[in-house]
């Protein structure tokens, strides 16, 4: 079987969430952080013939780049990665499931009190602001009836901040401050439908690709009716 550039791109993104991965038979891949506060799933255009574990996903992706047009031939304990000529081959061994961090179950997403579209341009602005200001938190709040995303230091009220107003669905009579750690916002570039629940979890659905993320909020997040 072959691995497309699109599948490789998703795997590279998932390697930023967790270096290891258990890939199940079929065309759906999933990963979760060691802290179990970020879960990601994607439907890819590769149909894997069996379950197999990869301990170092970046190394595996790098191995695929050693040959042109990599073709994968699966065996019970390893995969042979060959090139288009049949001259070059890589024998890559799998890792046992017990050595990997894997999602134990699907997340039952609670109903979200706040919904909005996070477009790629806004996401890029937030990331740039976080890098420039040296902050690692994104605040989603009701600012006098307007939904606002802010890059802040929630522990320092006099620190510099960046804010951008966006359109969204929420009860204007509620007061909420949902805090996300920017380091957990490891989503692939694109536009997203976002839903945030007062149960301290957020859900991101890519609008152009079957990729989803569930990201826990920081415990200091608040929601008041």
Question: Where do the PLM segments sit?
Answer:
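DNA polymerase processivity clamps
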Residues: 1-93, 112-225
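Long, charge-dense
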Residues: 98-116
């Amino acid at each position: 079987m072959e691995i497309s550039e699109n599948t490789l791109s998703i795997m590279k993104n998932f390697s930023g969430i967790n270096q290891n991965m258990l890939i199940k038979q079929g065309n759906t891949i999933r990963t979760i952080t060691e802290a179990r506060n970020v879960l990601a799933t994607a439907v890819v255009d590769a149909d894997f013939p069996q379950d197999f574990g990869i301990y170092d996903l970046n190394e595996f992706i790098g191995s695929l780049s050693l040959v042109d047009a990599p073709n994968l031939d699966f065996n019970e304990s390893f995969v042979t990665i060959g090139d288009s000529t049949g001259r070059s081959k890589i024998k890559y061994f799998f890792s046992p499931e017990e050595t990997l961090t894997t999602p134990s179950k699907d997340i039952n997403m609670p109903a979200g009190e706040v919904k909005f579209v996070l477009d790629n341009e806004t996401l890029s602005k937030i990331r740039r602001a976080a890098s420039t200001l040296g902050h690692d938190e994104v605040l989603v709040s009701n600012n006098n009836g307007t939904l606002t995303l802010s890059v802040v230091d929630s522990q320092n009220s006099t620190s510099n901040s960046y804010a951008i107003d966006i359109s969204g669905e929420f009860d204007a009579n509620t007061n909420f401050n949902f805090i996300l750690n920017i380091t957990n916002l490891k989503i692939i570039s694109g536009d997203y439908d976002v839903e945030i629940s007062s149960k301290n979890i957020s859900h991101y659905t890519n609008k152009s690709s079957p990729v989803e993320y569930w990201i826990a909020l920081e415990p200091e997040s608040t929601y008041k009716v």
